[in-house]
Amino acid sequence: MSLVIAVYGKGGIGKSTTSANISAALALKGAKVLQIGCDPKHDSTFPITGKLQKTVIEALEEVDFHHEELSPEDVIESGFAGIDGLEAGGPPAGSGCGGYVVGESVTLLQEMGLYDKYDVILFDVLGDVVCGGFSAPLNYADYAIIIATNDFDSIFAANRLCMAIQQKSVRYKVKLAGIVANRVDYTTGGGTNMLDQFAEKVGTRLLAKVPYHEMIRKSRFAGKTLFAMEEAQTEFPECLAPYNEIADALMQEHPIASVPVPIGDRELFKLVNGWQ
């Protein structure tokens, strides 16, 4: 059975870039990885495959939504380091429900028996609204990871995600492996001062600290993981280190994880004054 990881974070937080680099680090350490993009934007696997691949919803449309007519080859593309990628996709803007599409994709994976074919399955999930469909990966995940930056809006979203994880943990095995601090800037962004306090408050840890670095942005535009960028390998190893740390933590026999204890919304707003 695969190790199933669900990566969440608010839109624009760098969640997909982080997910792709975690997948790359895991693959380079010997794991067979499937990364699943669960966002209507369907660009999660772009750094792995170098293209916007066909989505599950597009493939289903071609067979008039008869699941049984699809095979893994219809929806999976292989890319960097042998990583396989799948994109759930979503309905046209202004119509349908993106969460429903994610839920359908999770069901399709089960029907195809893919949960037994990989060492690691990593879901990259939109985390602004954790409704039924978008929370579906938590039903299968061993561990959740939250991507956040050192600002209130990001922490507010992270707290809502902690609520979802706590609720799911009542019926499912999922636990929170930690928070990845992204775009860490000690010059103007306060480092991780707010995230450190939040993590302690909800009973988790900072799994890694990813620096705010031009090299990471360049890799995204190039359609590559950092591990595929020679410049990153030779000149900016500090950009690669956090993803290797995360991979090492996840590949332990018993990764450190916990059920978070979220803060009430009003309490969180009150705490902000102490973080200024």
Curated annotation (Swiss-Prot):
Q: What is its EC number?
A: 1.3.7.7
**Which InterPro entries does UniProt cross-reference here?**
NifH/chlL_CS (IPR030655), NifH/frxC (IPR000392), P-loop_NTPase (IPR027417), Protochlorophyllide_ATP-bd (IPR005971)
Positions bound to Mg(2+): S16
Give a yes or no for keyword 4Fe-4S in this entry: yes
Keyword NAD belongs to the record: no
Q: Which residues bind [4Fe-4S] cluster?
A: C97, C131
Identify the cofactor(s).
[4Fe-4S] cluster
Name the pathway.
Porphyrin-containing compound metabolism; bacteriochlorophyll biosynthesis (light-independent)
Q: Which UniProt keywords are given for this protein, alphabetically ordered?
A: 4Fe-4S, ATP-binding, Bacteriochlorophyll biosynthesis, Chlorophyll biosynthesis, Iron, Iron-sulfur, Magnesium, Metal-binding, Nucleotide-binding, Oxidoreductase, Photosynthesis
* Biological processes, Gene Ontology terms: light-independent bacteriochlorophyll biosynthetic process; photosynthesis, dark reaction
Highest taxon above the source species: Bacteria
As its record notes, the protein acts as a catalyst of:
chlorophyllide a + oxidized 2[4Fe-4S]-[ferredoxin] + 2 ADP + 2 phosphate = protochlorophyllide a + reduced 2[4Fe-4S]-[ferredoxin] + 2 ATP + 2 H2O
Q: Where does ATP bind?
A: G12, I13, G14, K15, S16, T17, K41, N182, R183
Entry note: cofactor? Binds 1 [4Fe-4S] cluster per dimer.
Q: Name one GO molecular function term.
A: 4 iron, 4 sulfur cluster binding
Q: How does it assemble?
A: Homodimer. Protochlorophyllide reductase is composed of three subunits; BchL, BchN and BchB.
Q: Please state which protein family the record places this protein in.
A: Belongs to the NifH/BchL/ChlL family.
Function description: Component of the dark-operative protochlorophyllide reductase (DPOR) that uses Mg-ATP and reduced ferredoxin to reduce ring D of protochlorophyllide (Pchlide) to form chlorophyllide a (Chlide). This reaction is light-independent. The L component serves as a unique electron donor to the NB-component of the complex, and binds Mg-ATP.
PANTHER family associated with the record = LIGHT-INDEPENDENT PROTOCHLOROPHYLLIDE REDUCTASE IRON-SULFUR ATP-BINDING PROTEIN
Q: Supply the name of the protein.
A: Light-independent protochlorophyllide reductase iron-sulfur ATP-binding protein
Organism in which the protein naturally occurs: Chlorobium chlorochromatii (strain CaD3)
At the highest ranks, the source species' classification is: Bacteria, Pseudomonadati, Chlorobiota, Chlorobiia, Chlorobiales
Encoding gene per record? bchL
